[in-house]
Design a protein with these regions (language model features):
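Helix-turn-helix
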Residues: 21-25, 29, 33-67, 71
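Short coil/turn segments at alpha/beta junctions that flank glycine-rich nucleotide-binding fingerprints
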Residues: 36-40, 91, 112, 156-157
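Hydrophobic/aromatic-rich alpha-helical bundle segments in the mid-to-C-terminal region
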Residues: 116-117, 121, 128-136, 154-202, ...
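Hydrophobic alpha-helical connector segments
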Residues: 71, 85-115, 167-171
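N-terminal intrinsically disordered/low-complexity leader segments
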Residues: 1-21, 32, 211
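Short hydrophobic clusters on alpha-helical segments that form packing/core surfaces
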Residues: 26-34, 76, 80, 105
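Short alpha-helical functional segments enriched in proximate histidine and acidic residues
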Residues: 33, 87, 108, 149, ...
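Amphipathic alpha-helical linker/stalk segments
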Residues: 72-100, 130-136, 140, 152
Length: 211
């Protein structure tokens, strides 16, 4: 299904001296343009026009559109990492920690669909592996925090099937699949999203973990 995407909104030109606008404003405009026009169609000029500054002013913040796209991903992964670290250190059962992390992941995706698509749906594959190295390291840290309690469950002999690593990958993949469908196919007659998330987590965790 092809989404009908709106053309990015063009802001009035900022008065001279306002070229130091917050990076967040640039990133928000860039998100919309990357989603609407794809990587090839997104240009520094279009992003600058959308926030009402000159291309020269935008280059004061970002050297190219690759850096913008990577920062969008880094910000998203960084937020999820902070959540995972917080949950990982809570004195509750490992299964409860896994559930909280996955709930937070899905809610983040659905509350920030543009950000999520750019960070987790292959948009950055056009960027060289060298440029993506720092982002990949951040992603590995985020996944390590998530998979930690799953390895605890495995070490305690509570997994019905698979290993800690395979269980972690399946849990992530399943939740990613749900939110990706909800984001990219919003016009389907979906059940309420909270119910879908609950059914997904109930089915996955009850199927993988013994009582």
């Amino acid at each position: 299904m092809t989404l009908a995407l709106k053309k990015p909104h063009k802001s009035a030109r900022k008065p001279k001296g306002d070229g130091h606008l917050r990076r967040g404003e640039i990133l928000a405009a860039a998100e919309r343009i990357f989603i609407a026009e794809g990587y090839a169609g997104a240009t520094i000029r279009k992003i600058a026009d959308a926030v009402g500054v000159s291309s020269t002013a935008l280059y004061m913040h970002f050297r190219d559109k690759d850096q913008i796209l990577l920062e969008i991903g880094d910000d998203a992964i960084g937020q999820l990492l902070a959540v995972n670290v917080d949950i990982a250190h809570r004195p509750i059962d490992a299964v409860a920690r896994v559930r909280l992390m996955l709930e937070a992941y899905m809610k983040f995706a659905l509350d920030n669909p543009n950000t999520y698509q750019l960070a987790f749906c292959g948009s950055r594959d056009v960027i060289s592996k060298e440029k993506q190295a720092a982002t990949a390291e951040l992603g590995d840290r985020c996944f390590a925090e998530f998979s930690g309690p799953i390895h605890e469950i495995a070490a305690a002999g509570r997994l019905r099937t698979g290993s800690g690593e395979s269980a972690a990958q399946v849990l992530w993949a399943a939740c990613h699949g749900l939110v990706a469908l909800l984001i990219t196919m919003p016009d389907r007659n979906w059940a309420p999203r909270e119910e879908l998330m609950k059914v997904t987590l109930d089915g996955l965790l009850h199927g993988l973990v013994t009582d």
